[in-house]
Regions:
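Conserved redox-cofactor binding core of oxidoreductases
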Residues: 93-179, 191, 232-241
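Conserved N-terminal glycine-rich FAD pyrophosphate-binding loop of Rossmann-like flavoproteins
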Residues: 38-69, 75, 230-236, 241-246
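An anion/pyrophosphate-binding glycine-rich loop and adjacent beta-alpha core
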Residues: 215, 221-333, 337, 390, ...
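Helix-loop-beta segment of a Rossmann-like dinucleotide-binding subdomain
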Residues: 76-80, 111-136, 196-200, 299-312
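Core beta-strand elements of the Rossmann-like FAD/NAD(P) dinucleotide-binding domain
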Residues: 4-7, 178-187, 361
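Short beta-strand "acidic-cap" motif of Rossmann-like dinucleotide-binding folds
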Residues: 30-36, 224-225
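Glycine-rich loop(s) and the adjacent beta-strand/alpha-helix scaffold that form part
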Residues: 187-242, 379-399
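Glycine- and aromatic-enriched mobile tails/lids
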Residues: 1, 5, 16, 24, ...
Length: 558
């Protein structure tokens, strides 16, 4: 009926952090099973990420300055031990990527080409050729050379297994066969990305649904700062053919690269300089409130007033902005045409609370990448996301191996839990009068989140949103129905996703209600001030009840 596969290390997630964790664990001699929701190296956020990765490689720069810039960019909310680990390890992990086959843009003398991004005191963004896909492909090639890894894709994890308070593996659904199986492991690493798909306008892939984060919460994981969602200012909102494409404003506005402008609906420049993402997002929000936004609620980027010649612009657009050619295919030439953009959900700053070694509050459970919550704080600096995947993927892999070496075999009886999942799936397949498909329920949830938990929040809107989410879970979720087929029934995956999304939406809203201040990407109309002392919002599930608290930000160990 079901299989139990044994591993020393179970890695959940096939993006940059998960693959890096699996590589480290396998190189340390552990038997590794990696579960990925989609095809490895072509799923999740990593393959669609931009080309920037941060590392202090230039003369005059240092890991100490990288640390200081990141702490400042996080608006006081980044845990300093984690930031220190990120800054100290990033260069070594970049060299690892080169050894795996990743290619970087280089200067004529062979040094790394870099660019300056908002918040950096030194030019620190390196360029991976091929962007996130180039990174993912190099990791995948390295992974395939290691003999002690079992890769299972088209697998959606249903439940984390906890025995005697320790992580013991997971139950997953094989989408290809429709069968439910178990991985029993001495330690587990969760690296499943963010939850941007809670909102309808995002530049991330549709599998960034966050149900794995809800699953970790149900298992007892300590979550932190879930209200902090980074809205990237520069995502195409019109024309429809390009909606959701990220166009890096850091290149557009950089006077040394493209020297562009940002204009409101009246054609006026409304922000100058080189703003950080949260500052830019708030400026766009102000244009919307004043009625001076572009027709679709955003702004325009304009290169027609650039000080550079058309020839120089062409060379730089082709070299620095891969979206240039894509936009031309849908009728937009950035040299001649204004492009309408708006803020979109781009990166989840909240997630599982970890220490600098990727350890969570559950013994044997480790986490890395965007699923974690206390690395960047209330705003993330460009390029640190890909660095984070490699630094903390490696650290979590190392620590998981140390734990597994000391852990005994975790025997268990899983039949009852597996049968429970078959019953759930069969209930969805049975069909219901007036049944609701997963995609319909997802759209309704996204509408709620956009209306009540968007760029601007207040107590009334958040409470209204919470009531709507609870109503959807109580009245609509029981009507969920999927196609009555077993093999490759992706509606079953979507059903599990929306079930987890509803759970996650509730605790995101509870966290937003608890943070009675404005900080970074969290803006409260009723609490526009920023508190003098930064704090984390912490939420845990204790005996079936949500326990919310404020906890201090971790300072750097001396």
């Amino acid at each position: 009926m079901f299989e139990v596969r044994m591993a020393d290390i179970l890695v959940i997630g096939g993006g940059g952090a998960g693959i890096r964790a699996a590589i480290t664990a396998a190189e340390l001699g552990q038997r590794v099973i990696l579960l990925s929701k989609g095809p490895l190296s072509r799923t999740g956020i990593t393959p669609v990420a931009g080309e920037g990765v941060e590392g202090a490689v230039n003369e005059g720069d240092s890991s100490e300055l990288h640390y200081e810039d990141t702490v400042k960019a996080g608006r006081g909310l980044a845990d300093e031990n984690l930031v220190n680990a990120l800054a100290q390890d990033s260069i070594a992990r970049i060299h690892d990527l080169e050894s795996y086959g990743a290619k970087f843009k280089k200067n004529p003398d062979g040094s790394f080409a870099t660019s300056l991004r908002p918040g950096q005191t030194h030019s620190r963004n390196l360029f991976i050729i091929g962007g996130g896909y180039g990174l993912a492909a190099s990791l995948f090639r390295k992974l395939c050379r290691l003999p002690n890894i079992l890769l299972i894709d088209d697998a959606i994890v249903i439940k984390l297994l906890i025995q005697d308070g320790k992580a013991a593996g997971a139950i997953y659904l094989d989408i290809r066969t429709g069968e439910v199986h178990v991985v029993s492991a001495r330690s587990t690493i969760i690296a499943i990305g963010g939850y941007e798909e809670l909102w309808p306008f995002t530049d991330t892939p549709p599998d960034t649904t966050g149900e794995g984060l809800a699953m970790a919460y149900q298992a007892g994981a300590h979550l932190i700062d879930l209200e902090m969602v980074l809205y990237y200012p520069g995502v195409v909102v019109y024309p429809p053919a390009a909606r959701g494409w990220l166009v890096q404003y850091e290149y557009i506005l950089n006077p040394d690269i493209l020297d562009g402008r940002v204009l409101n609906g009246k054609g006026e420049v409304f922000i100058g300089g080189f703003p950080a993402r949260d500052e830019f997002m708030r400026a766009v929000r102000d244009q919307v409130k004043q009625g001076t936004a572009s027709p679709h609620g955003g702004f325009y980027v304009d290169l027609t007033q650039s000080r550079y010649s058309r020839e120089v612009l062409t060379e730089r657009l082709e070299s620095w902005l891969h979206q240039f050619s894509n936009l031309k295919q849908v009728g937009i030439d950035l040299r001649d045409d204004k492009l309408e953009m708006a803020p979109a959900a781009h990166y989840c700053l909240g997630g599982i609370k970890i220490d600098e070694f990727g350890r969570t509050n559950i013994e044997g459970l480790f986490a890395a990448g965007e699923v974690t919550g206390n690395v960047h704080g209330a705003n993330r600096m460009s390029g640190n996301a890909l660095s984070e995947t490699q630094v903390f993927g490696n650290r979590a892999g190392q620590q998981a191996c140390e734990f597994a070496a000391k852990a005994g075999v975790m025997p268990g009886s899983y039949e009852a839990e597996v049968l429970r999942e078959y019953k759930t799936v069969n209930g969805w397949r049975a069909g219901k009068d007036k049944g609701v498909r997963p995609i319909e329920l997802k759209a309704r949830l996204q509408d709620v989140m956009a209306q009540f938990v968007g760029l601007e929040r207040d107590e009334q809107s958040l409470n209204d949103g919470l009531a709507e989410v609870c109503k959807l879970r109580k009245d609509v979720l029981p009507l969920l129905t999927v196609l009555p087929i077993r093999r490759f029934c992706y509606e079953v995956q979507e059903a599990y996703e929306i079930r987890g999304m509803l759970d996650l939406a509730e605790i995101v809203i509870l966290s937003a209600l608890d943070r009675k201040e404005t900080r970074g990407h969290h803006y409260r109309l009723d609490y526009p001030q920023t508190d003098k002392t930064p704090y984390h919002t912490s939420i845990r599930l204790v005996k079936g009840e949500h326990k919310i608290a404020t906890i201090p930000v971790t300072k750097l160990k001396s």
